């Protein structure tokens, strides 16, 4: 018996996405996405409502700056106090989980999906998906790309322009192409917010 596409996705097997109701699910998500991206800046309540409708789960005080782009939206889980700047792109053929207090800078891409390297294995659009998990208190810099199957640990910072191909542990600063750990986050970081600029008082 052939395995349904949704089961193939969960099992990490190759799949195609033009059957079994998947196009209809994408259309629903992209219709909401279109409405959100074309809303007026003054329509704050409308945007708040659409954020809750576009994504699978959304915590309190979550905000996304338009435009935002995704495949379905219904596979994206967002925690509390989330903020994403403009041009966030999420390829969510499978689950994307974002923790609490996460900040995402402009032009970031999270993609759970890739294609086989050999051309014969992707001639019909075959692809694979592995979930992405972003921990709590993570800050992702601008123009970062996060590849399929990656987990970023709690409290970590991903430097601008990084391509993240492997898991990043908690409590580190990581950057580069490919992304690698630069250093651990330490007590000095509690007192200096940028280079030698010292924190004088709470904002």
From Swiss-Prot:
Active-site positions on this chain: 115
UniProt-listed NCBIfam families: PRK09527.1
Species annotation: Escherichia coli (strain K12)
Protein name: Galactoside O-acetyltransferase
GO cellular component terms, semicolon-separated: cytoplasm
Top-level taxon of the source organism: Bacteria
Post-translational events: The N-terminus of this protein is heterogeneous because the initiator methionine is only partially cleaved.
Keyword Acyltransferase appears in the UniProt entry: yes
An annotated Gene Ontology molecular function: identical protein binding
């Amino acid at each position: 018996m052939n395995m349904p596409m949704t089961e193939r996705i969960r099992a990490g097997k190759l799949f195609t996405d033009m059957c079994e109701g998947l196009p209809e699910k994408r259309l629903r998500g992209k219709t909401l996405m279109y409405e959100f991206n074309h809303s007026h800046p003054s329509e704050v309540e409308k945007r708040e409502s659409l954020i809750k409708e576009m994504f699978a789960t959304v915590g309190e005080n979550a905000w996304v700056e338009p435009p935002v782009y995704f495949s379905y939206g219904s596979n994206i889980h967002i925690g509390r106090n989330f903020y994403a700047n403009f041009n966030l792109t999420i390829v969510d053929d499978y689950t994307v989980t974002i923790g609490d207090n996460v900040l995402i800078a402009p032009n970031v891409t999270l993609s759970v999906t890739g294609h086989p390297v050999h051309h014969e294995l992707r001639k019909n659009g075959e692809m694979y998906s592995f979930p992405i998990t972003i921990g709590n208190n993570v800050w992702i810099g601008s123009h970062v790309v996060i590849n399929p199957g990656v987990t970023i640990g709690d409290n970590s910072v991903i430097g601008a322009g990084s391509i993240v191909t492997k898991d990043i542990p908690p409590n580190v600063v990581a950057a580069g192409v490919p992304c690698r750990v630069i250093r651990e986050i330490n007590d000095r970081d509690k007192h200096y917010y940028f280079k030698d600029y010292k924190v004088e008082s709470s904002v």
